[in-house]
């Protein structure tokens, strides 16, 4: 299965759907779904996902290179892994999504959207995770969902962590730092993201990794993400990652800006970068009689997008943590 990406993009079913790699077994579970199981018993399970948005191609190319290293034997596998290319049709078309944003649909929220390829795919991915985690006795469960951002950012690489009732494990946060993430953003409320689903339903340590900016296939400068690729290689092979990195800055979400109607106006232009700072009292958005202003001394914007569909998030406001 050294042509997983090509098969996924073409929508082709392989003639052989399971086989042996270098020290592991592989199973093709469906378009964009590949399970890898080491020959030696392991108690760690990892979801590696990318392509939930079809125009975010750099992480897909990164995963393809990791798979090539595993099949060639230059990389040893020490985790059970489910590789997920989230939205094959959108990836093939080079668009963010075909009908609706799948990363708002998980946790059963797909039932609230008009039926589409994305709602069916979200349901399929939920079932795939349930099957994967229930078929083993993993003591450690991780989910790394790789993305790129629509906008530029004051932090080239950053992570977004779902709301979680328990403290985050230090080795997980340390690995995120070793992977080159410059900032970590902690959600304070549930959401429809893939990582919130895996965390809430299966207890996985989950993070959405935002790596640079969305570009078409073969236009990505993957050298920008060498540190992340190296950390992923070390993780898969069970090698300790470097500890000589600057700890990521930490932020928490303090509010969400939501577009409810065509009267919505977001007062940020197309050049506003992620993590741009705004002072207390700054008017951020208006919608009819409703005004959204900065309530803390300083807040930072994440994912500003004035053109989202009504009812969806037009931005998150953050505060820095000590």
From Swiss-Prot:
Annotated cofactor note: Binds 1 zinc ion per subunit.
Q: Where is the active site?
A: 210
Q: Could you tell me the EC number(s) of this protein? A: 3.5.1.96
What's an example of a GO molecular-function annotation for this chain? hydrolase activity, acting on carbon-nitrogen (but not peptide) bonds, in linear amides
This chain's function reads: Transforms N(2)-succinylglutamate into succinate and glutamate.
Task: Name the protein family.
Answer: Belongs to the AspA/AstE family. Succinylglutamate desuccinylase subfamily.
Can you name this protein? Succinylglutamate desuccinylase
What organism does the record attribute this protein to?
Salmonella typhimurium (strain LT2 / SGSC1412 / ATCC 700720)
């Amino acid at each position: 299965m050294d042509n997983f990406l090509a098969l996924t993009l073409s929508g082709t079913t392989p003639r052989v759907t399971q086989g042996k790699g270098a020290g592991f077994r592989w199973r093709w579970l469906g378009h964009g779904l590949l399970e890898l199981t080491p020959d030696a018993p392991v108690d760690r399970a990892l979801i590696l996902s990318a392509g939930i948005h079809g125009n975010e191609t750099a992480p897909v190319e990164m995963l393809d290179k990791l798979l090539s290293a595993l099949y060639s034997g230059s990389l040893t596998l020490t985790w059970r892994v489910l590789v997920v290319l989230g939205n094959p049709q959108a990836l093939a078309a080079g668009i963010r999504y075909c009908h609706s944003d799948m990363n708002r649909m998980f946790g059963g929220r797909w039932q609230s959207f008009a039926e589409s390829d994305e709602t069916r795919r979200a349901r399929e991915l939920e079932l795939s995770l349930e099957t994967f985690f229930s078929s083993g006795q993993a003591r450690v469960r991780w989910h790394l969902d790789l993305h790129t951002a629509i906008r530029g950012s004051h932090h080239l690489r950053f992570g977004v962590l779902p709301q979680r009732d328990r403290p985050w494990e230090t080795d997980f946060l340390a690995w995120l730092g070793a992977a080159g993430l410059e900032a970590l953003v902690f959600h304070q409320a549930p959401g429809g993201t893939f990582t919130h689903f895996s965390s809430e339903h299966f207890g996985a340590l989950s993070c959405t990794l935002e790596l640079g900016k969305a570009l078409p296939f073969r236009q990505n400068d993957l050298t920008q993400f060498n540190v992340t690729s190296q950390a992923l290689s070390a993780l898969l092979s069970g090698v300790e990652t470097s500890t000589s990195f600057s700890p990521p800055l930490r932020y928490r979400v303090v509010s969400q800006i939501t577009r409810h109607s065509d009267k919505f106006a977001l007062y940020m232009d197309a050049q506003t970068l992620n993590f741009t700072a705004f002072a207390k009292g700054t008017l951020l958005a208006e919608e009819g009689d409703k005004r959204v202003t900065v309530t803390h001394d300083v807040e930072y914007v994440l994912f500003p997008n004035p053109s989202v569909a009504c009812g969806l998030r037009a931005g998150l406001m953050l505060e820095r943590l000590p």
